[in-house]
From Swiss-Prot:
Keyword set, alphabetical order: Host membrane, Host nucleus, Late protein, Membrane, Phosphoprotein, Transmembrane, Transmembrane helix
Gene name per UniProt: NEC2
Name of the protein this chain belongs to: Nuclear egress protein 2
Subcellular location: Host nucleus inner membrane
Species of origin: Human herpesvirus 1 (strain 17) (HHV-1)
The family this protein is said to belong to: Belongs to the herpesviridae NEC2 protein family.
Record PTM text: Phosphorylated by viral kinase US3.
Residue intervals passing through the bilayer: 252-272
Region (Interaction with NEC1): 137-181
């Protein structure tokens, strides 16, 4: 079972100490913490022995977040591992010990979907790995998504016996948790679609910019001239438009046409005077 931790570039000892401190923050403060195996460990160099340990005194009633702790260890590691928690009745207290791998001759298989309660006599030991926990959760058909069912250990220390109850506990409001997960998924999909639309719009604008450059290169960058008026055109406006489109011929033809037009005007004026 491979871990999902991120590379750590600082001092290896600081990385491992940070993991232990995070575990201490989520474990009940009534459990006394102890030191595990000393050494310069990192996500790629895991301890081969006990990584952390906690003690519960006689008469205490504790709840240990076993699944959260094991998954925290698995996510921190960068190499394959199968975190394991061992619980022992020492005769005077209960001892919780965490390992990145199941120790040799460590008990296993005591916790099953049918058997979730264990009574430890003096010096007796039990334990559970993350792989076995996932198997139990799958056989029970529980929701494996984050923030849903998570295993806890209810520990009752009454010497010379220690009673353990392994229970899956979910959120106080499962419907609200599902809505939060659905809303988070919808927001992620919306962000993905918005990013896709932005990229498509940017590509379309870039294409229009290239086409516009070619249009200006042909000398038509200013486009068609706007109309001078929005209302009906007047006669003299139409005459001006006609003059704009009038084509002038050769100079000799223009001179001959002028002479003919002048003679016609002179003849009309003379004829009118005689009448």
């Amino acid at each position: 079972m491979a871990g999902l931790g991120k590379p750590y570039t600082g001092h290896p000892g600081d990385a491992f100490e940070g993991l232990v401190q995070r575990i201490r923050l989520i474990v009940p403060s009534t459990l006394r913490g102890g030191d595990g195996e000393a050494g310069p460990y990192s996500p790629s160099s895991l301890p081969s022995r006990c990584a952390f340990q906690f003690h519960g005194h006689d008469g205490s009633d504790e709840s240990f977040p076993i699944e959260y702790v094991l998954r925290l260890m698995n996510d921190w590691a960068e190499v394959p591992c199968n975190p394991y928690l061992r619980i022992q009745n020492t005769g005077v207290s209960v001892l919780f010990q965490g390992f990145f791998h199941r120790p040799h001759n460590a008990p296993g298989g005591a916790i099953t979907p049918e058997r979730t309660n264990v009574i430890l006599g003096s010096t007796e030991t039990t334990g559970l790995s993350l792989g076995d926990l996932d198997t139990i959760k799958g056989r029970l058909g529980l929701d494996a998504r984050p923030m849903m069912a998570s295993m806890w250990i209810s520990c009752f220390v009454r010497m010379p016996r220690v009673q353990l109850a392994f229970r899956f506990m979910g959120p106080e409001d499962a419907g609200r948790t599902r809505r939060i997960l659905c809303r988070a998924a919808e927001q992620a999909i919306t962000r993905r679609r918005r990013t896709r639309r932005s990229r498509e719009a940017y590509g379309a604008e870039a294409g229009l910019g290239v086409a516009g450059t070619g249009f200006r290169a042909r000398g038509d960058g200013f486009g068609p001239l706007p109309l001078l008026t929005q209302g009906p055109s007047r006669p003299w406006h139409q005459a001006l438009r006609g003059l704009k489109h009038l084509r002038i011929g050769p100079p000799a033809l223009v001179l001959a046409a002028g002479l003919v037009l002048g003679a016609a005007i002179w003849w009309v004026v003379g004829a009118g005077a005689r009448l």
